[in-house]
């Protein structure tokens, strides 16, 4: 079955996956925001807006390519994921 995700879900899943791969809630993005947006077939401004919303909601903090996950549970709720 094909699962369709919203932009917010895609970005949340991506951030959680990057955290898992880096074994840390504080990590650097390896691709540009443009490259990440293209991989989701969305516009760069949609990705940036989503990251700003996540930051405003207290889920993450960004500093350039650095991402810090502040509220993993909230981010997982957006991603519709559960801890494994």
Each language-model region and where it sits:
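Short, Lys/Arg-enriched, Trp-marked, Pro/Gly-tolerant hinge/linker segments that flank
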Residues: 1-7, 24-27
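Phosphate-/nucleic-acid-contacting segments
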Residues: 18-84
